């Protein structure tokens, strides 16, 4: 289970400015962002591939949340107003040392790309997606995906840390 860190708090800060009927968090981790979404949305759902993270959320997140153990947004056939995700974003080409909570693939964005593709199937036409990216990741691959899927990416907020810059981006349909 991914414990809250600078990236989690940055996503929570950005997500707190959104309101609507329904929200989904992909990769709930400890549930810090999920809890915040309950304050601004009537219907809140969360997914994680880690059953331990979901068990933790059951005991620590408000009862208003629907939780599903699944890959990205694959369990939902619903159009959410907001989808948020803090996917693993560190590059790693060594499968033997891969930590699925932080390593997002060879270029760091493979997991994020998979999540965006899945999320767009569950996103309302007017909906928004918030995603955390890092300067350690190959963001040009995200831009290529945006172009191919006719999506728009807007930088919402950045936080410079000692070794990297974290950023939250809003993704929407064009």
Residue ranges and their predicted role:
Residues 13, 111-170:
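Conserved Class I SAM-dependent methyltransferase catalytic core
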Residues 58-59, 95-98, 142-144:
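Short amphipathic alpha-helical segments
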Residues 40, 99-102, 147-148:
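Glycine-rich, phosphate-binding/catalytic loops in enzymes
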Residues 87-114:
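Mobile active-site "lid"/loop adjacent to the S-adenosyl-L-methionine
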Residues 47, 105, 131-132:
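Active-site-adjacent beta-strand anchor residues
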Residues 7, 49, 107, 111, ...:
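Soluble or luminal CAZymes and related metallo-dependent hydrolases
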Residues 4-85, 91-92:
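Conserved SAM/SAH cofactor-binding pocket of Class I
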């Amino acid at each position: 289970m991914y414990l809250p860190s600078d990236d989690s708090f940055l996503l929570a800060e950005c997500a707190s400015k959104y309101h609507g009927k329904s929200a989904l968090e992909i990769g709930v981790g400890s549930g810090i962002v999920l809890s915040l979404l309950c304050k601004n949305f009537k219907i809140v759902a969360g997914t994680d591939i880690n059953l331990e993270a979901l068990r933790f959320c059951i005991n620590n997140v408000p009862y208003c949340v629907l939780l599903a153990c699944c890959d990205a947004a694959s369990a939902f056939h619903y159009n959410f107003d907001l989808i948020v995700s803090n996917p693993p974003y560190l590059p790693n080409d060594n499968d033997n040392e891969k930590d699925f909570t932080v390593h997002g693939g060879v270029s760091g964005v493979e997991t994020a790309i998979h999540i965006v593709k899945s999320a767009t199937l569950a996103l309302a036409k007017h909906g928004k997606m918030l995603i955390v990216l890092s300067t350690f990741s190959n963001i040009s691959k995200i831009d290529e995906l945006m172009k191919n899927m006719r999506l728009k990416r807007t930088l919402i907020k950045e936080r410079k840390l000692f070794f990297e810059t974290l950023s939250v981006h809003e993704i929407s349909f064009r």
